[in-house]
């Protein structure tokens, strides 16, 4: 693994920059979100959205999706070459909601992709600003992570649905770059690899010829990304085995599934970033805030402060609970779908409840839903405290690879002990330790068994008052250990179908 010196921070990945100091990073991240904000303001002008309509999260999502679609070169090329009836490859659009005579009306709009690309570049000093595009992809991914379960996808890959906490970023597009790779969970990477190996098993030519060479490079790159997420030598050595396999097949799939299970205790490093909807940045820009001058960070207090004074709305279906809709969006904004609910309760200052008990469906409204009965309400996205986002999975004693917890991938660097029964997890490891990876498997199982409960606690800082911008006085919350802290436990959330 690269030593700390060569590791780029998320913000550098996000902004495609070389090594920068903290001030430069804050400025370039500020430039990125400022560009998103300027673009949003301009789009509202183009579409003649009034202030209230511009603050509607559904309109924000449509506008974000339009610009992402305009810049999706591979798909654009595919659409040009495979024209489908009634679809103009040069246009993009979606539903825009307007307030007419006290009701919300849906209007389907179409815009030239060229025109949207022009507006985006203009808002970003004439550049393509890929970092800003990736940022919006991560926001959509975080929203999906909070809204949907991926049990079906897990089962298809031969994995256990209880591993859903490892699935962060599972809906991110391939083109999301280094910043996207950083936020993908261990389960997500494993699933991508298993899909690839399965294709290789079924299709003899998958690894052959010029295309096969490119496939092989992609396979090894994905293996390296996954290896970099593991923090113990044995897990990494197993990844080397998987990567170097001449002809990846069922043995590799077995190894990968074993590694995924091990990540429930020996947690991987997965980055967390607070990516907000474009309309939030737009509001700040419209009020004259200069992100680049002030600087911005995705992992500190800034997103909390921004949400503290942004009033945005959401459409609400008749049987939905507005407070529950707010919780869903709040969790998505902070990339907290897999965080311990007790930590979220404390930070948000209001009760955060598991997905299965939320009376709300996804944020987006399907085109066949009846608008007559749809109302809107303010999203409550404020918090009581703030905390620093983690990228390590919270294992500070790296060299001893402290253990993690089942069903939670911490988002916030907040100290807590972890609610899980080691016995439950260890039960998943009975059986197969033979084969080429036997010594590594044995070593991993030994580490998991020996994880003492203090190793299993999450070493972190505390939370901070919103007035404490420099994070000088950590408050270490004490948690009631009696209840399980997982959002998706005992759940009936809808499945994500792409």
Curated annotation (Swiss-Prot):
Chain residue ranges for the region called Disordered: 1-21
PTM statement from Swiss-Prot or TrEMBL: Late in virus-infected cells, may be cleaved from a 56-kDa protein to a 53-kDa protein by a cellular caspase. This cleavage might be a marker for the onset of apoptosis in infected cells or have a specific function in virus host interaction.
Compartments where located: Virion; Host nucleus
Motif window: Unconventional nuclear localization signal: 1-18
GO molecular function: RNA binding; structural molecule activity
Placement of sequence motif Bipartite nuclear localization signal: 198-216
InterPro entries from the UniProt entry: Flu_NP
Main localisation: virion
GO annotation (BP), single: viral penetration into host nucleus
Signal peptide (UniProt feature, chain positions): none
Alphabetized Pfam families for the sequence: Flu_NP (PF00506)
GO cellular component assignments: helical viral capsid; host cell; host cell nucleus; ribonucleoprotein complex; viral nucleocapsid
UniProt entry tagged with the keyword Cytoplasm: no
Record field: transmembrane: none
Protein keywords: Capsid protein, Helical capsid protein, Host nucleus, Host-virus interaction, Ribonucleoprotein, RNA-binding, Viral nucleoprotein, Viral penetration into host nucleus, Virion, Virus entry into host cell
RNA-binding as UniProt keyword: yes
Subunit structure and binding partners: Homomultimerizes to form the nucleocapsid. May bind host exportin-1/XPO1. Binds to viral genomic RNA. Protein-RNA contacts are mediated by a combination of electrostatic interactions between positively charged residues and the phosphate backbone and planar interactions between aromatic side chains and bases.
UniProt record similarity statement: Belongs to the influenza viruses nucleoprotein family.
Function per UniProt: Encapsidates the negative strand viral RNA, protecting it from nucleases. The encapsidated genomic RNA is termed the ribonucleoprotein (RNP) and serves as template for transcription and replication. The RNP needs to be localized in the host nucleus to start an infectious cycle, but is too large to diffuse through the nuclear pore complex. NP comprises at least 2 nuclear localization signals that are responsible for the active RNP import into the nucleus through cellular importin alpha/beta pathway.
The protein, known as: Nucleoprotein
Phylogenetic classification of the source organism: Viruses, Riboviria, Orthornavirae, Negarnaviricota, Polyploviricotina
Gene behind this protein: NP
